[in-house]
Amino acid sequence: MFNTHKVEIEWGGRPLTLETGKIARQADGAVLATYGETAVLATVVSAKEPKPGQDFFPLTVNYQEKTYAAGKIPGGYFKREGRPSENETLVSRLIDRPIRPLFVDGYKNDTQVVITVLQHDLENNPDILSMVAASAALTISGVPFMGPISGARVGYIDGEYVLNPNIDEMPESKLDLVVAGTSEAVLMVESEAQELPEDVMLGAVMFGHKSFQPVIDAIIKLAEVAAKEPRDFQPEDLSELEAKVLAVVENDLREAYKITEKQARYAAVDAAKAKAKEHFFPEGVEETEMSAEQFATIFKHLQAKIVRWNILDTGNRIDGRDLSTVRPIVSEVGILPRTHGSALFTRGETQAIVVATLGTGEDEQMIDALTGTYKESFMLHYNFPPYSVGETGRMGSPGRREIGHGKLAWRAIHPMLPAAEQFPYTIRAVSEITESNGSSSMATVCGTSLALMDAGVPIVRPVAGIAMGLIKEGERFAVLSDILGDEDYLGDMDFKVAGTEFGITSLQMDIKIDGITEEIMKVALEQAKGGRVHILGEMAKAISSSRAELGEFAPRIEVMNIPTDKIRDVIGSGGKVIREIVEKTGAKINIEDDGTVKIASSNGKEIEAAKKWIHSIVAEPEVGEIYEGTVVKTADFGAFVNFFGPRDGLVHISQLAADRVAKTTDVVKEGQKVWVKLMGFDERGKVRLSMKVVDQETGKEIVAEKKKEEVDAE
């Protein structure tokens, strides 16, 4: 019934298996991939024909994690998986980025790649395996995909590169780098690093590229026995039509791309396009040399050609800069004084308002992952409203791009955050992109660094980011610093580097062509370093280190530790005690399993009141100390006084006053505040208190006062 094919190799010390022919046989391509005991299913389906009028390639990648893969049942009312998590969105993008440029130009059939995590061994992260499985499924599907590709994770532990470190090893690693590519070239890099130098980062990229070659060989081996017949697709030859359009629009486009202001430049390009349309689609003529879709494709291609020729021939860019110059920068902090920390970062026509907000443990994000539930105390959210590019558009929940850009900035900042013991706050940074003309994610990095310093978050060092680009024709190439939106769209590489003056904290690279050598990447990294240091210098004009104090409106958090066996006393039955403390003092309280107690409030008196209350619950009263208490009950033989948190003690009638007392209620009443001295404990452990040795007005010991008076008299 099944015509199965399987390839198995040893990779990174674990078995990797690729199997097809048994599951999802109606898909164009389907591969079950297993690494260790983690298993994923990748499927590919591509429409037989493009939709009429389609002028782009509609590729969708969906990575989905099923909770059954880790032996779990989803939470929530419906008990089933819902909308994609942030991690699922990020992994979908991670797979999309290296496979998209490998589809043949002109292929516009609706294509969907679905990767499902079926089993997770809690050791091997399924993201790399999913990339491998998707590549294998595409390679055997018959669609015009110029792969295969593979990917690898590279760690850096004790000065050595580690291939595909398992989940338990990652906390020891100074690097979390994912690299993907073909047998000849690197196509994609995504990473977070602990201030590593450029040569270590480049070495990791090349180590990963070399390490995944056996996987590419395994995919080719599988395709040799299991691949479907390639689809009969021939890219349309538009060279003759392109030459005709070029003759009409070249001068207009060259003039348009000399305009430095973005909106004016776009208007000039639109005018050139409209003029060419009039020429090739005269009014009233039904039969034309080309279709509207062909014209749109050609015009986009010519835009790229004009810009690229100009840069390579003259070294001058669209806005008049040379290759390595960064646009003018203005940094401001404290622009929203009621917030905890704020910054406005402007670089050319790209601008971000970033606001930092500090919270308590209650504000931490709960993340329910396949590996278990954990809390995240640092959140960075990136918003890209349509007005930032002068357009109208959809508003609402963040899209894949916004989630991806936010995570890139998060990776850049995260290594520089203080330890929780040093700074026990939950931090949320929100970047509102108010203008965009290239590299808004790197503006977010710079703005977040400024806003955190303005908020008084003691980051290790300021972080800046820069986006690099590449134009390559044959042996000629130009590396561009701080690229514009057009240079990103029309170029061959998007290369984002963030870090401090001492090293890289995040690197993201997307390459659209083959032939990007190690030498070119080295040039780009060195040029990026110069740009990053320049940007840090510009940022320092606004603020160079974290403020010594938190903002006026930020909450204060103090930390105290209590014995773990006292946690239940502080919480109380059903949370009764801790709720009372919160209600009476107004402070927020978070108690962790190890006995760490975080008390937060914007009012210092509330924090002190809560600390004092908790201390009274967990501490033991000391014999000979004087305490303030409240009479809770009277009896013939004395009064019971609550004096130390939940503790009560007896003041015997003989200890109520210096003179003889006939009746307890002659001296005290229930609810009365009194001063008592702890005299000791009886043979049954009951507390013995005395009021008569304490001045009820001052709370000072009477005997001690008399002795002091005697000493003073002498």
UniProtKB/Swiss-Prot annotation:
Domain KH positions: 555-614
Pfam families xref list: KH_1 (PF00013), PNPase (PF03726), RNase_PH (PF01138), RNase_PH_C (PF03725), S1 (PF00575)
Main location: cytoplasm
SMART domains assigned: KH, S1
Keyword Cytoplasm applies: yes
Amino-acid positions noted as binding Mg(2+) in the UniProt annotation, renumbered to this chain: 488, 494
Catalytic activity field: RNA(n+1) + phosphate = RNA(n) + a ribonucleoside 5'-diphosphate
EC assignment: 2.7.7.8
GO cellular component, one term: cytosol
PROSITE patterns on file: KH_TYPE_1, S1
UniProt xrefs under SUPFAM superfamilies: Eukaryotic type KH-domain (KH-domain type I) (SSF54791), Nucleic acid-binding proteins (SSF50249), Ribonuclease PH domain 2-like (SSF55666), Ribosomal protein S5 domain 2-like (SSF54211)
Entry GO MF terms: 3'-5'-RNA exonuclease activity; magnesium ion binding; polyribonucleotide nucleotidyltransferase activity; RNA binding
Sequence ranges assigned to domain S1 motif in this UniProt record: 624-692
HAMAP family for the chain: PNPase
Family per record: Belongs to the polyribonucleotide nucleotidyltransferase family.
Protein name, entry field: Polyribonucleotide nucleotidyltransferase
Source species of the chain: Brucella suis biovar 1 (strain 1330)
